[in-house]
Amino acid sequence: MKRIADEELVREERAEESTQKWLQDAKFQEILGADSSHKSLFVLLSHPDGSQGILLANKSPFSEEKSDIEKLLATAQLQEISRNDIFGSYNIEIDPKLNLLKSQLIYPINDRLIAKYRQEEKFVIRETPELYETVTRPYIEKYQLNLNWVYNCLEKRSEVDKIVFEDPDNENGFVLLQDIKWDGKTLENLYVLAICHRHGLKSVRDLTGDDLEMLYNMRDKSLEAINQKYGLKTDQIKCYFHYQPSFYHLHVHFINLKYDAPASTTMSAILLDDVINNLELNPEHYKKSTLTFTRKNGDKLMEMFREALKN
């Protein structure tokens, strides 16, 4: 077992070295977008080998640990901007270790990933069950992003160190793991994903009353695991689906209620408890309802809806 663990460590170190080398050789190409409210920047990179990548850079939230606050105060260098009586405005330089960027590097990438992160004007789509069958389902079957990374997580071929909890049952089980946007330490922006083991469920559209046992299981065991590992209570956690989701294998988002996570308060977020309640009242709710979401201008699904609604 030790030999296997050592080999895994060597593979991870080589992968990190390869990624570091790729980033060092890459050149800035374009700013795809920025989000001032979340202190995020999406940068398109080009590499001499012809490949492209996207760097997603996010400023980490402040730690509330006493030792970190004391270190911040001890290292702070003030640069005065203005002063009026007792009120002063300053730029402050602090220890770089207290001002890290939480980042994600995606490479090599294709045009669909570039389009995903490029900021464009958004529009509302009202998707009837008929439009789901004639527009959205064909879109998913033809254009959905590769799910290999999801299967790697479910089968423990990667990101094993990020697993918080697992129920291995093939029908109602799931893996609960740290989202790539979370550093695994700062509770203020806790973000974990519950990914179901069962294949074939793409989104809330596929859910019926027959799936309630799985949803109860994912909700209750995830909240219990978060409480046991991180100390957050049930009423401090927001759990929700995205529709449309970023990838089409059923998963639930769990975040600290304090954290204003990207797309957690938009039209794309549907609370897990609301999904459960709707299916308890009507087992076919998501098969028969019109679902509303937003899509960016130039997005392929947006184009397909516009074309369908012309006719």
UniProtKB/Swiss-Prot annotation:
It is found in: Nucleus. The hydrolytic product 7-methylguanosine diphosphate (m7GDP) efficiently inhibits the decapping scavenger activity and acts as a competitive inhibitor in vitro. It catalyses: a 5'-end (N(7)-methyl 5'-triphosphoguanosine)-ribonucleoside in mRNA + H2O = N(7)-methyl-GMP + a 5'-end diphospho-ribonucleoside in mRNA + 2 H(+); a 5'-end (N(2),N(2),N(7)-trimethyl 5'-triphosphoguanosine)-ribonucleoside in mRNA + H2O = (N(2),N(2),N(7))-trimethyl-GMP + a 5'-end diphospho-ribonucleoside in mRNA + 2 H(+). Pfam families: DcpS, DcpS_C. One of its GO terms (biological process) is deadenylation-dependent decapping of nuclear-transcribed mRNA. InterPro entries: DcpS/DCS2 (IPR008594), HIT-like_sf (IPR036265), Scavenger_mRNA_decap_enz_N (IPR011145). Substrate binds at E159, K181, H242, Y243, Q244, P245, S246, F247, Y248, H249, L250, H251, V252, H253. Keywords: Hydrolase, Nucleus, Stress response. Expressed in neurons in the ventral cord, the nerve ring and the pharynx. Its EC number is 3.6.1.59. GO terms for molecular function: 5'-(N(7)-methyl 5'-triphosphoguanosine)-[mRNA] diphosphatase activity; adenylylsulfatase activity; RNA 7-methylguanosine cap binding; sulfate adenylyltransferase (ADP) activity. A motif (Histidine triad motif) lies at residues 249-253. One of its GO terms (cellular component) is P-body. Induction: Up-regulated by heat schock. The active site is at H251 (nucleophile). Belongs to the HIT family. Decapping scavenger enzyme that catalyzes the cleavage of a residual cap structure following the degradation of mRNAs of the 3'->5' exosome-mediated mRNA decay pathway. Hydrolyzes cap analog structures like 7-methylguanosine nucleoside triphosphate (m7GpppG) and tri-methyl guanosine nucleoside triphosphate (m3(2,2,7)GpppG) with up to 2 nucleotide substrates (small capped oligoribonucleotides) and specifically releases 5'-phosphorylated RNA fragments and 7-methylguanosine monophosphate (m7GMP). PANTHER family: HISTIDINE TRIAD HIT PROTEIN MEMBER, M7GPPPX DIPHOSPHATASE. This is m7GpppX diphosphatase. It comes from Caenorhabditis elegans. The lineage of its organism: Eukaryota, Metazoa, Ecdysozoa, Nematoda, Chromadorea.
